Amino acid sequence: MTPLALIMIIIAYLLGSISSAVLICRLRGLPDPRTSGSQNPGATNVFRLGGKGAAGLVLLCDILKGMLPVWGGYFLESNPLLLGIIAIAACLGHMYPLFFHFKGGKGVATALGALAPIGLDLTGLLFGTWVVIVLITGYSSLASMATALLAPLFTWLVKPQYTLPVAMLSCLIVLKHHENIRRFFAGKEKKIW
């Protein structure tokens, strides 16, 4: 691994470690999403705590945290494996942020941003899958997990060389949803609205 590759991975992790949910809630005078609502610093919890505007800002910032470092890797002509590692680093930063005591979100929006540079067709498939499942079931967590599980298949159909890193990222997202899975099967998982 080259020094530049290592620097790109570190930058991706540090960028991912900026918790937009916590910062936006502070700026808007909302409760800390790590200790309120579902206690997850992500767009869905911020939606419940502060409405569409705050959640939209969190969603945008979280997508950009994943997108910018991967686009940087594309610009520097990194190979697919390195781009995957950069994407995973950004998501790990979001999930386990250095700046916020390693208590982060689930990484769904950051992963969407990290996968967006692969292509708009993949982004559309992922976003469309999430929306359809939310509209049918009302569960953001179920939509996120189902979309994560389908992401490697969609990637294989669009650009197969990225399938392995996307599969690794998908595993991280599903594992991060372990509490949601438990609540869902216990009948205690909350719907998005």
UniProtKB/Swiss-Prot annotation:
Listed name of the protein: Glycerol-3-phosphate acyltransferase
Protein family according to the UniProt entry: Belongs to the PlsY family.
Catalytic reaction list: an acyl phosphate + sn-glycerol 3-phosphate = a 1-acyl-sn-glycero-3-phosphate + phosphate
Top-tier EC class: transferase
Pfam families found in the cross-reference section: G3P_acyltransf
Organism: Aliivibrio salmonicida (strain LFI1238) (Vibrio salmonicida (strain LFI1238))
Quaternary data: Probably interacts with PlsX.
Membrane-topology descriptor: Multi-pass membrane protein
Protein task: Catalyzes the transfer of an acyl group from acyl-phosphate (acyl-PO(4)) to glycerol-3-phosphate (G3P) to form lysophosphatidic acid (LPA). This enzyme utilizes acyl-phosphate as fatty acyl donor, but not acyl-CoA or acyl-ACP.
Enzyme Commission number, as recorded: 2.3.1.275
BP GO annotations: phospholipid biosynthetic process
GO cellular component terms, A-Z: plasma membrane
